[in-house]
Amino acid sequence: MDEISLRPFDRMDFDRLISWIDSPEASVQWAGGFFRFPLDAAQLEGYRGSGEGELSTRRIFTACDGRGDRVGHIELSDIDRHSARICRVLVDPARRGNGIGSGMVRQVLRLAFDELRLHRVELLVFDFNMPAIGCYEKVGFVREGHLRDARRVGDKYWSLEQMSILEAEWRARQETTSAATGDDR
């Protein structure tokens, strides 16, 4: 897998992101009730604008591979002096299973812990989304709780897993990784 880089989410990313959200269920799985299906440019323009400015509590990113191809979307939200939440994580459906998700999450954690100096990063993920849960556990998140029947989708209820990682856990993983690879970043 190529190294993943993040850049600010922009208008040129709208069509690609819209093409990845092909059903009401996919919309809920990606964004909860934040957007209505079908996703459109007007909704994304308001969303993009909410991540701009010095006082914004969210950072919205497009993930790119080593060739610069757009391969995902990720947001760091609810940023305060101590914590934040990862949300609206999506990998191009044609590129899933190649480590892109974990690469995106690692980049956001670098921002959270190295640049913003946060103590904790959390997230919520639907309990049936085992590939995503595996991705988050791979980078060091731990499960903290189970929210039963937390979201209604059509005539069914979906449950959520709450997960988090603390700065000390992240740093310990980085030291272990650096020692194993000989990388002194």
Regions found by a protein language model. Name each.
Residues 136, 141, 163:
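Conserved active-site tyrosine of GNAT-family acetyltransferases
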Residues 8-14, 19-96, 111, 115-116, ...:
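Acetyl-CoA-dependent GNAT
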Residues 82, 119, 142:
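Short acidic/polar active-site loop segments enriched in Thr and Asp
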Residues 114-124:
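Conserved GNAT acetyl-CoA-binding A-motif
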Residues 91, 97-111, 134-138:
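Conserved acetyl-CoA-binding loop-helix of GNAT-fold acetyltransferases
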